[in-house]
């Protein structure tokens, strides 16, 4: 037991740090924003350092229910980085409404996501997922005085409960037909051709996970929740949980369902096709920038699923690279949105209100253009590279029609990204005076993200290839 505890330092640090942050908020009150914000940031930094220290370890703990390996470590670093930024930029948005619960909930959500990424058992999978989900429901409705935020939290909770029920039913079927909840045991019990009961179990488990990554047709909550939730919370939803759920999905289909590739691959292909098509088409005509970015996230999840559908190490490497680039791009785009304010200091979310932004705030307009072009996967921006990797993996796995469909969807999706850029640069100024006004921290993060996507990212391709290959090899 003591040896096992020494290998889960990231989780222990997050647990202790979350409790300390909560107590600080309880005893110091909501006026000491900087204190509990600093506590949460230091906790995440320490957890990331612990994850890096364990990067060379490959073992299991607690009777094989959790895995300590490079794959989980890679995912955790992305999760902790996204959580760090979402806490760092939050106080200015809430302007007096910031409470200690916000960083505490982020910490416990990060704890749950880390467990998801390291799970090797259906029970730990569910515990991690629910820990993340329960924190997320509260975060979505964090602005209690805002009707949209309360509505977003309620929608997320109701649909999330439905997805959890589907996942639990799938888990019960897998356990009933294999006699175990361990991933390795499930893979051994599946053998060659799975029976109809196991196939139903696979369908329900992947459906529950599909909700967490906003894959079509389990995406219904995404546009409404992204629009209604506070922007820092939306930024969090669009980044860290996607990494955790995609890592979990990769681990369960490769580790637990590997022998039944013929069954799960068809499901993943369907989710990928539906997501890239509806994500591209659904964004056309959107007038709210947060709703549009919600459809963009659905579209990008579809591209990640193309790499996963390949079922090869090359495909998983592409997915990991995609997650990193997507994280940088999405965080940058939402940080730009976070800085869009009118003269009254209110958040500007309407796309028509961005008309003439290039004249009022040329730096923000230029950065947003970089992020949008990168989300579209237009070369030479770095967002093109992960799309190329997942398409290459699909072609090498004889999934040429899927790769072709992805390319067509990329072309369609580029339309609405370019439409926003056209609004910012070529339309007449809107009546809304967008003042911006981000602080130095936000400006630095936005500038660094844009620079990385413009050119610097390509310099990291060799290092990223080594890291993603090492992480993906754990599953094969």
Swiss-Prot record:
Its EC number is 7.1.1.-. It comes from the Bacteria. One of its GO terms (biological process) is ATP synthesis coupled electron transport. It is found in: Cell inner membrane. It is a multi-pass membrane protein. The chain crosses the membrane at residues 5-25, 38-58, 70-90, 97-117, 122-142, 157-177, 196-218, 231-253, 264-284, 292-312, 318-338, 364-384, 401-421, 445-465. It catalyses: a quinone + NADH + 5 H(+)(in) = a quinol + NAD(+) + 4 H(+)(out). GO terms for cellular component: plasma membrane. The keyword Transport applies. Keywords: Cell inner membrane, Cell membrane, Membrane, NAD, Quinone, Translocase, Transmembrane, Transmembrane helix, Transport, Ubiquinone. The keyword Cell membrane applies. NDH-1 is composed of 14 different subunits. Subunits NuoA, H, J, K, L, M, N constitute the membrane sector of the complex. Belongs to the complex I subunit 2 family. NDH-1 shuttles electrons from NADH, via FMN and iron-sulfur (Fe-S) centers, to quinones in the respiratory chain. The immediate electron acceptor for the enzyme in this species is believed to be ubiquinone. Couples the redox reaction to proton translocation (for every two electrons transferred, four hydrogen ions are translocated across the cytoplasmic membrane), and thus conserves the redox energy in a proton gradient. This is NADH-quinone oxidoreductase subunit N. The lineage of its organism: Bacteria, Pseudomonadati, Pseudomonadota, Alphaproteobacteria, Sphingomonadales. The gene is nuoN.
């Amino acid at each position: 037991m003591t040896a096992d505890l020494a290998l889960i330092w990231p989780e222990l640090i997050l647990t202790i740090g979350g409790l300390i942050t909560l107590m600080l908020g309880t005893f110091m009150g909501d006026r000491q924003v900087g204190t509990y914000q600093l506590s949460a940031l230091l906790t995440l930094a320490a957890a990331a350092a612990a994850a890096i220290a364990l990067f060379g370890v490959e073992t299991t703990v607690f009777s094989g229910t959790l895995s300590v390996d490079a794959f989980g470590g890679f995912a955790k670093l992305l999760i902790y980085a996204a959580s760090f930024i979402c806490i760092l930029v939050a106080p200015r948005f809430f302007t007096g409404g910031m409470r200690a619960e916000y960083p505490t909930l982020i910490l416990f959500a990060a704890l749950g996501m880390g467990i998801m990424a390291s799970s090797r058992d259906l029970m730990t999978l569910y515990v991690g997922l629910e820990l993340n989900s329960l924190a997320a429901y509260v975060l979505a409705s964090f602005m209690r005085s805002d009707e949209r935020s309360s509505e977003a939290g309620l929608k997320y909770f109701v649909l999330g409960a439905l997805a959890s029920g589907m996942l639990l039913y799938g888990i019960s079927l897998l356990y009933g037909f294999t006699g175990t909840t361990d991933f390795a045991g499930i893979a051994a019990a599946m053998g060659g051709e799975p029976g109809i009961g196991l196939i139903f179990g696979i369908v329900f488990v992947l459906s529950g996970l599909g909700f967490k990554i906003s894959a079509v047709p389990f995406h219904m909550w995404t546009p409404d929740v992204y629009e209604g939730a506070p922007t820092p919370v939306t930024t969090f939803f669009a980044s860290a949980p996607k990494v955790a759920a995609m890592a979990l999905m990769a681990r369960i289909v490769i580790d637990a369902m590997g022998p039944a590739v013929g069954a799960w691959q068809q499901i993943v292909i369907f989710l990928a096709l539906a997501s890239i098509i509806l994500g591209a088409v659904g964004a056309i005509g959107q007038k709210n920038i947060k709703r549009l970015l919600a459809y963009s996230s659905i579209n990008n999840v579809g591209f990640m699923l193309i790499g996963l559908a390949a079922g090869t190490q090359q495909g998983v490497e592409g997915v990991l690279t995609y997650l990193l680039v997507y994280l940088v791009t999405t965080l940058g785009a939402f940080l730009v949105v976070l800085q869009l304010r009118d003269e009254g200091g209110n958040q500007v979310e309407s796309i028509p209100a961005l008309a003439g932004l290039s004249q009022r705030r040329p730096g923000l307009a230029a950065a947003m253009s970089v992020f949008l072009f990168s989300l579209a996967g237009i070369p030479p921006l770095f967002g093109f590279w992960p799309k190329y990797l997942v398409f290459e993996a699909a072609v090498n796995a004889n999934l040429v029609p899927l790769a072709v469909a992805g390319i067509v969807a990329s072309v369609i999706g580029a339309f609405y990204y370019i439409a926003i850029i056209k609004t910012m640069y070529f339309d007449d100024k809107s009546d809304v005076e967008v003042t911006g006004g981000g602080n130095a921290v936000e400006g630095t993060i936005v500038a660094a993200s844009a620079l990385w996507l413009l050119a610097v990212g390509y310099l990291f391709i060799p290092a990223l290839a080594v890291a993603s290959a090492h992480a993906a090899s754990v599953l094969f």
